[in-house]
């Protein structure tokens, strides 16, 4: 699977795929998702990650996209922002042959 260089924050995806086309605002969507308005606003504005709980709520509200979809999008976004040099000093740790087959 090819890695996207700069994947969008899943909150932006939520905004573009659902909120804007359906004419939903943050307040009414937060109520429908049973979550604080401030939390949804932070997600949509890329200031907060989509948690597993929120992903399940999004799946229920918008069944076209599964909770796994939202979590994969969040993981892809987070990984794209990792400093590639953060592990420069990390050395491989020898594991048992049994672990290599897993």
UniProtKB/Swiss-Prot annotation:
This is Virulence-associated protein A. The keyword Transmembrane does not apply. It comes from Dichelobacter nodosus (Bacteroides nodosus). Residues 14-69 form the HTH cro/C1-type domain. The gene is vapA. Keywords: DNA-binding, Virulence. PANTHER family: ANTITOXIN HIGA-1. Residues 25-44 bind DNA. One of its GO terms (molecular function) is DNA binding. The keyword Cell membrane does not apply. Pfam families: HTH_3. CDD domains: HTH_XRE. Gene3D superfamilies: lambda repressor-like DNA-binding domains. InterPro entries: Cro/C1-type_HTH, Lambda_DNA-bd_dom_sf, Toxin_antidote_HigA. Disulfide bonds: none annotated. Belongs to the VapA/VapI family.
């Amino acid at each position: 699977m090819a890695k996207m260089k700069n994947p969008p924050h899943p909150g932006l995806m939520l905004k573009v795929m659902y909120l804007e086309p359906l004419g939903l605002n943050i307040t009414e969507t937060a109520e429908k998702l049973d979550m604080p308005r401030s939390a949804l606003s932070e997600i949509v504005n890329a200031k907060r990650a989509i948690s597993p709980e929120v992903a399940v709520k999004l799946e229920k509200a918008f069944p076209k996209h599964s909770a796994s979809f939202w979590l994969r999008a969040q993981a892809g976004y987070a990984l794209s922002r990792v400093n590639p040099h953060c592990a420069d000093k990390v050395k491989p740790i020898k594991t048992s042959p049994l672990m290599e087959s897993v």
